[in-house]
Amino acid sequence: MLTGVENSESGVIDLIKPGLDDVMKNETVQVTLVNSVLGWCKAHIVDPIKTSKIVQSRAFQITMVVLGVILLIAGLALTFVLQGQLGKNAFLFLIPAVIGLVKLLTTSVFMEKPCTPEKWRLCKRLLATTEDILDDGQINQSNTIFTTESSDVTNTATQS
């Protein structure tokens, strides 16, 4: 069937892509995207779970908080206690600490109120530091996904 309309998807994508890269560096756009994703997660995942009977019980709520704190403390303690014996691989014990910290942060900070630029900067720095430690066991700015330069660029852009 001839409609007279050409399929020019590649042309449209080529026109949008250069501007999209610049837009994605804007911290306001990043925060808006984070809030959209968190809103979807809250509406489709968190709220249905929160309304279940088991999650509403006080025992379950206390257990989740205690579990997050235990993971955080145990991961940090094992990292420092066993660093001499494990050497470079001691950073693997940070994984439970990071999971516990992320669990506590997401339940207390991000799921109840919208994300602000300050919270987003804090989250990006936490992720950058975590990636830097997990890639080679040292804090040496060797991360590639969550770089501190990208968060510094957005900090200077919002301050000027």
Swiss-Prot record:
The chain crosses the membrane at residues 62-82, 91-111. Pfam families: CRPA. Keywords: Membrane, Transmembrane, Transmembrane helix. The keyword Phosphoprotein does not apply. InterPro entries: CRPA. It is found in: Membrane. It is a multi-pass membrane protein. One of its GO terms (cellular component) is outer membrane. This is Sulfur-rich protein.
